């Protein structure tokens, strides 16, 4: 019998003796249990890729339990019902109606599923600092068994070394005993939701007043801001450490409890009057979803300056629906394009992070679209024809619609070809229009703050974004203008449905490939004209050359840059 099992048995016996002498102190979920989950479990049991959808970052997630249905599935023919924690159901019964089953409840004379999983792991501990047994499969692509309580015995027999925590040295004896005592007592959860401090409450009210101000112009700006900040973990100037908030749509106004409008996408029809509310982020903070954005007096002043300083008007508020989702340039055309672009430039690191670290970029299929390392630059608004030339903007806007709204599996090819051709028509329009403009140079790049230069690093099946140009000059660079930055954000963050079917996901990722190509071609226009074909030949080799011929609009190799740009970057 392993020494560790003997020790834990002795401790369990000792705790029983102590219990006979007097009641042990009550175990608190918040004080005693969540810290164990945070230290030992959330690395695998958080976010959409929680094993078996068992999210142990909060009491709500632990109570919700597990499901055999994975969130990430690039082959399903029908979209599945969303199962976003805190959004799509509340309480154990509601989640069980969506296919979840308890891991905390005892089953007759049998202990809770979690207790049995922990016991299996504790009974067969792994040797520290030794190679894992070959029979333990790991990785994002591993097939999780997700046994229900009645299936546990069969699971334990087939996978005797795959108790919990999986493939690590596991819990300390004290942690194990604490969890088992808690489960044996019925797994009570005393977790209280985070609440804003008095100072935060004042700032919450100020921001909610701004986004819920009356008037058509105010309503349109609020909708645009919400759609651009819904993923952010917001924090206040002078706020409490560890307190973050997120924008949500509610049926109730400020001052009343939030009645969440939980549509699949942030730009779906709410079906009722909308109030934009700030909701405290609940549960353990994990890196994958922690894309931060500060709220301050300076930020509010900047929003007011950008969006409310002009005399532009809204004649009619746009509705909702597939066409409105597909083309935000038409949906929000009443808002000055310069204001929209400048807001995104001011916060470029945040926006690039939303689509580089968001749900669309989980797994090799998505990150295969991008290269291992590249730099991102941005075109200055005063040199962006979409901002400065209303006639060009009017021609370009209908061509900027994005696919993915129609998820009919049988129509994937025809939809893809239609949107590819529309995108290439836009690229031809852009190429010809810029040919009549002053030659581009490095001075046409935006350099307004420290968001102006970004480095992106791909780590096989995930990616990260950092300010500054880091490392040696990469093989490729991306140059965003407003139409490209906005399309990237909407295609990969706003409109992407992680619960969508194979058609939706394929259209999204195929268009992402066109986005990458467009950003690379934008950058090449800064290079000496005679060198562009050589760069393309280096960037697109083997099957890439066929793809260039089949899907991409050709690069302009005749339009010369200014003398300053012809000096190049030494790439």
Where are these regions (language model features)?
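Soluble extramembrane regions of membrane proteins in the secretory/endomembrane system
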Residues: 162, 169, 173-178, 190
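Boundary at the C-terminal end of the N-terminal hydrophobic targeting segment
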Residues: 18-20
């Amino acid at each position: 019998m392993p020494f560790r099992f003997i020790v834990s048995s002795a401790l369990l016996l000792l705790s029983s003796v102590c219990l006979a002498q007097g009641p042990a102190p009550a175990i608190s979920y918040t004080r005693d249990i969540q810290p164990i989950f945070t230290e030992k479990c959330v690395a695998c049991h958080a976010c959409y890729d929680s094993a078996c959808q068992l999210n142990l970052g909060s009491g709500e997630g632990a109570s919700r339990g597990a499901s055999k249905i994975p969130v990430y599935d690039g082959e399903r023919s029908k979209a599945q019902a969303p199962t976003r924690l805190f959004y799509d159901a509340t309480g154990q019964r509601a989640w069980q109606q969506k296919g979840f089953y308890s891991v905390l409840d005892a089953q007759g004379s049998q202990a809770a599923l979690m207790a049995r999983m922990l016991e299996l792991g504790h009974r067969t501990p792994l040797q520290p600092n030794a190679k894992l047994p070959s029979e333990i499969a790991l990785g994002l692509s591993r097939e999780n068994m997700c046994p229900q309580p009645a299936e546990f015995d069969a699971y334990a027999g087939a996978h005797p070394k795959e108790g919990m925590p999986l493939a690590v040295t596991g819990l300390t004896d004290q942690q194990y005993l604490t969890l088992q005592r808690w489960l044996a007592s019925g797994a009570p959860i005393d977790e209280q939701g985070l609440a804003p401090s008095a100072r935060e409450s004042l700032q919450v009210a100020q921001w909610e007043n701004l986004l819920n101000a009356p008037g058509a112009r105010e309503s349109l700006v609020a909708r645009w801001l919400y759609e651009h900040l819904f993923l952010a973990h917001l924090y206040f100037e002078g706020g409490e450490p560890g307190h973050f908030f997120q924008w949500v749509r509610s049926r109730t106004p400020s001052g009343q409890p939030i009645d969440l409008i939980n549509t699949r996408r942030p730009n779906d029809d709410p079906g009722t009057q909308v109030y934009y509310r700030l909701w405290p982020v609940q549960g353990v903070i994990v890196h994958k979803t922690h894309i931060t954005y500060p709220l301050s007096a300076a930020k509010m002043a900047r929003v007011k300056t950008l969006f409310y300083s002009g005399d532009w008007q809204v004649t009619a508020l746009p509705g909702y629906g597939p066409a409105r989702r597909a083309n935000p340039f038409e949906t929000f055309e009443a808002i000055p394009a310069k204001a929209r672009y400048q807001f995104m430039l001011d916060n470029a690191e945040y926006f690039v992070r939303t689509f580089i670290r968001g749900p669309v970029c989980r797994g090799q299929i998505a990150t295969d679209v991008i290269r291992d390392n590249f730099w991102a630059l941005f075109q200055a608004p005063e040199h962006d024809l979409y901002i400065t030339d209303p006639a060009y903007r009017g021609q370009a806007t209908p061509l900027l619609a994005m696919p993915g709204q129609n998820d009919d599996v049988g129509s994937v090819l025809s939809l893809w070809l239609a949107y590819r051709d529309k995108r290439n028509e836009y690229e031809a329009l852009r190429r010809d229009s810029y040919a009549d403009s002053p030659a581009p140079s490095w001075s046409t790049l935006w350099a307004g703050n420290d968001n102006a230069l970004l480095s992106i690093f791909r780590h096989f099946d995930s990616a990260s974004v950092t300010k500054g140009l880091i490392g040696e000059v990469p093989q490729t660079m991306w140059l965003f203008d407003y139409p490209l930055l906005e399309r990237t954000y909407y295609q990969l963050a706003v409109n992407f449905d992680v619960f969508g079917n194979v058609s939706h996901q394929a259209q999204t990722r195929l268009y992402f490939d066109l986005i990458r190509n467009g950003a690379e071609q934008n950058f090449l226009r800064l290079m000496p004209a005679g060198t562009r074909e050589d760069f393309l030949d280096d960037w697109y080799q083997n099957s890439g050359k066929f793809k260039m011929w089949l899907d991409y609009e050709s690069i302009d190799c005749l339009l010369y840059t200014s003398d300053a740009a012809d000096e190049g970057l030494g790439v």
